[in-house]
UniProtKB/Swiss-Prot annotation:
Binding positions (Ca(2+) 2): D55, D108, D110, D115
General function of this protein: Required for proliferation and differentiation of shoot stem cells in the shoot apical meristem (SAM), thus determining the appropriate balance between the maintenance of shoot stem cells and their differentiation into other aboveground plant parts via the control of subcellular localization and intercellular trafficking of STM in the shoot apex. Prevents intracellular trafficking of STM to the plasma membrane in cells in the peripheral shoot meristem region thus facilitating STM recycling to the nucleus to maintain stem cells.
InterPro entries (alphabetical): C2_dom (IPR000008), C2_domain_sf (IPR035892), C2B_MCTP_PRT_plant (IPR047257), C2C_MCTP_PRT_plant (IPR047258), C2D_MCTP_PRT_plant (IPR047255), MCTP_C (IPR013583), QUIRKY-like (IPR047259)
Keyword tags: Calcium, Cell membrane, Cytoplasm, Endoplasmic reticulum, Endosome, Glycosyltransferase, Golgi apparatus, Membrane, Metal-binding, Repeat, Transferase, Transmembrane, Transmembrane helix
Deletion phenotype: No visible phenotypes. Plants lacking both FTIP3 and FTIP4 have a dwarf and bushy phenotype due to an accelerated stem cell differentiation causing early termination of shoot apices associated with an increased STM localization to the plasma membrane, but compromises nuclear localization.
Subunit structure: Interacts with and regulates subcellular localization and trafficking of STM.
Gene designation per UniProt: FTIP3
Basic and acidic residues bias spans: 1-16
Designated name of the protein: FT-interacting protein 3
Amino acid sequence: MQRPPPEDFSLKETRPHLGGGKLSGDKLTSTYDLVEQMQYLYVRVVKAKELPGKDMTGSCDPYVEVKLGNYKGTTRHFEKKSNPEWNQVFAFSKDRIQASFLEATVKDKDFVKDDLIGRVVFDLNEVPKRVPPDSPLAPQWYRLEDRKGDKVKGELMLAVWFGTQADEAFPEAWHSDAATVSGTDALANIRSKVYLSPKLWYLRVNVIEAQDLIPTDKQRYPEVYVKAIVGNQALRTRVSQSRTINPMWNEDLMFVAAEPFEEPLILSVEDRVAPNKDEVLGRCAIPLQYLDRRFDHKPVNSRWYNLEKHIMVDGEKKETKFASRIHMRICLEGGYHVLDESTHYSSDLRPTAKQLWKPNIGVLELGILNATGLMPMKTKDGRGTTDAYCVAKYGQKWIRTRTIIDSFTPRWNEQYTWEVFDPCTVVTVGVFDNCHLHGGEKIGGAKDSRIGKVRIRLSTLETDRVYTHSYPLLVLHPNGVKKMGEIHLAVRFTCSSLLNMMYMYSQPLLPKMHYIHPLTVSQLDNLRHQATQIVSMRLTRAEPPLRKEVVEYMLDVGSHMWSMRRSKANFFRIMGVLSGLIAVGKWFEQICNWKNPITTVLIHLLFIILVLYPELILPTIFLYLFLIGIWYYRWRPRHPPHMDTRLSHADSAHPDELDEEFDTFPTSRPSDIVRMRYDRLRSIAGRIQTVVGDLATQGERLQSLLSWRDPRATALFVLFCLIAAVILYVTPFQVVALCIGIYALRHPRFRYKLPSVPLNFFRRLPARTDCML
């Protein structure tokens, strides 16, 4: 049986017609755009006046129907209004126009059949063309006609023109491609939008001490701690070591806060009166907008805050003030960058405070052209369909393209730009299937399905070059990796100052505060989780929403979870890094064994020259590296990096390993499967444990050289050191180096297969393995 051909997961270079002109070499012959031009017929329905009444009451409920061939778009209707204003735009794709005339009909909405008020007909051959930066076409009044062509009462203000997707009316227009979508919410869900991430701050709460606390039970020493809450985040200090009514902590609690600040900081001082019972001794609420903002390492002033306590009086909750106070130093940290992405794929590294931002070094332009070969993501009317849209994120700016309805080869041709402040950043483009066009919210909360994702690191791009490639869209499923299609992108990174960009390579990757007052790894993990939750919640509340599953996929939430496949990939990445050293070791072994006598003799000569002229060693090394770099320039990568299934071990992963990777946390699998995976993990951990133990043994043997743990071995080593010191003192260094080098490169005739004396001595040294249980 013939095996099916392997799927093509490679990157392909494309030659699209960008901006109406061909791509010539690395430059554009037309500087219009990074996308292919798409022609549209635009119809702007502005308003009508003096419409005649059609009802028995003498009034009308007018709306406008714009018809072009089989495509039909309608405005909203007004109740009993003879001078309505709509100001709606309709866009018809020129590629799908199969008519010669455009008809705009004003109708009166009725229960049985809508009445005709009048119409305006346009010959498409007479419609003007407009391309920005031309000014918008001014709408005109047109007298309405009946079906016979006779003038009737009423006028309609319209503007009709041919344009491209660069027209400012394009984003808000009704599109003929989406004619099957109805409803205001559904139409809002298919339009292109630009979103901004909320401005995130680190909130530092330094809890110093409290005074004059009043515990209920005065006969015991209080076990007091402070609990702090900001929105959904809750942290607490340790129990104070000074068990008095004046406890001290001097402990930092870190939160993530987003502008505009909606929730206050709520602090409560609590006493642990029993293992599962805590008593509130006082609390206070502090609005975040009034807090100090710190931009450097200088400490802010501390303040005393009064504590309040709620007590029950006659079944009612009443607030009482008393003399208890808490001493704290609270500030919003503007000198840090709030990490909301995976550190490996960061798109922004600037601090929160805008005062600390440096000028941009360039501009990133991204053209999202089209996709091909998309897979069916859902069924509609008994057949597979896909309603695809793209999301791109770089820095604080998110963009969402319009949704192309029911197409496996959608064409977006939308272009976006971002300011670039650091070249060592990544732009992420994701493709999703829109599941909210036909009442998705009502059907059990449908989620937008992921089709694939592309990452492009800006530092891998040449400046001022247009990259046009087709990227494979790969998604990992429990049954293996699957190619969902391809997305065609055009990317250009323009540098405003080459010197400034080169200077960036000498600067720290993160703002200074990350190094002056570093946060712990556990703090960063917790804060990153909170930041992603805040960003996804805020973007979900936008209109139209950028849904939580989309935001989390773009931010790589959950990428830190255990994965056998990813562990194997990382292990082989380490082996790939070490392969160069291993190859050098094998080459040196061949030199020592005289596999190629001519090469070995040349190495002898080179070694003697370097020993006699040691000042040539460093220049020789750096000159060698320079020549290697120049030699490799001919074979430098000419394409951006892309998802590599072989490197990721996605094409060879075992189904059970993939099922484990997609398991929830905590696990939701049956106990027998969990037991099997636990035993497998124990087996792997046992091998790692053995390797770590062997490394520790070698280190302990080095320590035991002078520890007198083995008195004979230490005595021999000390005596050897004394003799070596005397010999090295009276013998020139060059002679010693020559002797050692010639001995290491000696002919196999003078070698023995038994281990050397130093190695035998080292292996006999004691380690602490004897003390292990």
